[in-house]
Amino acid sequence: MKISDGNWLIQPGLNLIHPLQVFEVEQQDNEMVVYAAPRDVRERTWQLDTPLFTLRFFSPQEGIVGVRIEHFQGALNNGPHYPLNILQDVKVTIENTERYAEFKSGNLSARVSKGEFWSLDFLRNGERITGSQVKNNGYVQDTNNQRNYMFERLDLGVGETVYGLGERFTALVRNGQTVETWNRDGGTSTEQAYKNIPFYMTNRGYGVLVNHPQCVSFEVGSEKVSKVQFSVESEYLEYFVIDGPTPKAVLDRYTRFTGRPALPPPWSFGLWLTTSFTTNYDEATVNSFIDGMAERNLPLHVFHFDCFWMKAFQWCDFEWDPLTFPDPEGMIRRLKAKGLKICVWINPYIGQKSPVFKELQEKGYLLKRPDGSLWQWDKWQPGLAIYDFTNPDACKWYADKLKGLVAMGVDCFKTDFGERIPIDVQWFDGSDPQKMHNHYAYIYNELVWNVLKDTVGEEEAVLFARSASVGAQKFPVHWGGDCYANYESMAESLRGGLSIGLSGFGFWSHDIGGFENTAPAHVYKRWCAFGLLSSHSRLHGSKSYRVPWAYDDESCDVVRFFTQLKCRMMLYLYREAARANARGTPMMRAMMMEFPDDPACDYLDRQYMLGDNVMVAPVFTEAGDVQFYLPEGRWTHLWHNDELDGSRWHKQQHGFLSLPVYVRDNTLLALGNNDQRPDYVWHEGTAFHLFNLQDGHEAVCEVPAADGSVIFTLKAARTGNTITVTGAGEAKNWTLCLRNVVKVNGLQGGSQAESEQGLVVTPQGNALTITL
């Protein structure tokens, strides 16, 4: 919401009350409580007829400081609330002096100044990183609509850039934007978002989570150009400042607090193909797709049935359309015999035509209006109603239907929709409708996730989810929603992926080739390269099929090349996936996350790091022209082998079987021996590649097992012209390629052979000494 009218005025009809003077400071257990008045109350006369703010400072985890600014404490505060991991034994220090009161957790502290000039400052090791000055937080009375709000304005320094706030398709850097955290089904071409997360971080190495599930209004360097303002309709405002000091460290703390991304199963990293949305399909159509992929030597790993696996107008009652799929169990069995995993589409709604609609209504499993009638409308499905997942019996009914599908052979679910949740309703458990609007996405996906956890096991559970709220990163994978089939939408999708990664989500995908309309072949081929260098890869569309031969013959070559490449890269990719699970670092990440000390990376949103060591710059033109930036160092193309210097921009032109994919120096990268599947024995026949190991540096490569643990570790250390290589753990028949090295002066512990990419060393054991 806009509070100010320029620098001097406030918006008409608003009355602002600010904490201006510290009246008293108390320590209550591990909390510091500050009572602050909106005027000078040293005279007793001024202690009457005035509000008194209560500011509570506490720490749910080390390095995280919570702030709760309260006006009326007796206001209703119904749930839902975010499921946060709050620890009770966090070590804090509280200091109360004549000049200030300070609360400290880890290296982060919050300091409230006493005396004439109010300020609330956040410091890291005594150095201020942000805060709010006089008249920049407090209470807003809106006489236009008789509503009350709380707000805070945190300072932005010179050159400070803001990221996150969920999956957003606008410019990656949020400065200058107004953001309302209200889930909407808006596609990728608008300011609306499927996944609103009231969490942001900055390039100064801290993050802020506003702990309110309802709509939070952010003015990010917009209303006040050097401040992030956030406001909420409430009698209190609670937020957490999360220390870094690096972007990765911020996400580590944030996901420890709100939940780690689960580790998806290895097979989910392969290629997914779907029926598309409104296309005509039956078992014969499905078989033609799958057999066509096999005939063209196109690896395929997951097949997805979209909405029309059920009868029209009845979504979502979980019954196969008997006219289109008369033998679903047999069909699924036949498809799985071909080595495929099966996914089906679901959503949390039910059409009035469904035979089970009356049963659901009578049992109270559907969302009601305050007068007791069902909430219904005719968008999406005629007479559509919404499952009330605050009713445990409704959850059980829904879960039992899903379990029946799993018993039939379904491996996972595309959990679509969940954004357009109304507020003129009465939830079964009395939840606040304003808060449940966004949080519904969490309980919906949690329910489906738990079904898979209870049936196939947590290590095999995976979703394909569109909507999300805080904590939903625990239920991967998420995809970017409805995009158009053009380069602009491809770039929008990438911005959304980088944005959601900066909001705590580890795994992300998008509709390769675009969802709406049918892409020209050149767009499809460029998008395939981008899509298969994403954490998860799915060919999906709306009114047309996405099989590559529907475009041209070269599209088959492109899909084949990049699918095979991804399968070989699984050793690297799954180790990065395990790190996402352990630390919250997204697999696909903005350049600023990996290179926070390089200011040239702050605004980059047309390229990304795929894991720690590989830079990818998708091509957004038919001709193949692409510009990209490489940070400091010497970078090598993953398969072309050309080397480029960093700390500069580069301009190239690429065919459809290529794009900029550069590996940073001092990297030891593992490639597997199987280009047909993502799930195979990764520690057998591993080809390690050593890129530009510099004197005094060590490169380490960890080969994962299917559970994400490390099964083999290879290290290469260089001193002068000598490289010492040692392996530990279980590995068979591995080799080491010294990229762009054509000969060496000495080799102990193995044999050597020439290759186009560099000298290939085959060890006799697990130790090598190489003299350059």
Give the residues covered by each predicted segment:
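A low-complexity, Ser/Thr/Gly/Pro-enriched, surface-exposed linker/loop concept
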Residues: 2-43, 49-99, 140
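Catalytic and substrate-binding clefts that recognize carbohydrates or anionic sugar/phosphate headgroups
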Residues: 2-4, 15, 47, 70-72, ...
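Short, well-ordered beta-strand segments enriched in hydrophobic/aromatic residues
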Residues: 34-36, 57, 69, 102-107, ...
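Conserved, mostly hydrophobic/aromatic
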Residues: 57, 199, 293, 335, ...
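Aromatic- and carboxylate-enriched substrate-binding clefts and catalytic-loop regions
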Residues: 70-72, 81, 299-559, 594-598, ...
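Solvent-exposed beta-strand/loop surfaces of large extracellular or lumenal domains
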Residues: 77-93, 368, 638-656, 746-765
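Catalytic core of carbohydrate-active enzymes
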Residues: 449-462, 468-479, 492-496, 500-510, ...
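Surface-exposed interaction regions enriched in Ser/Thr/Asp/Glu
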Residues: 764-772
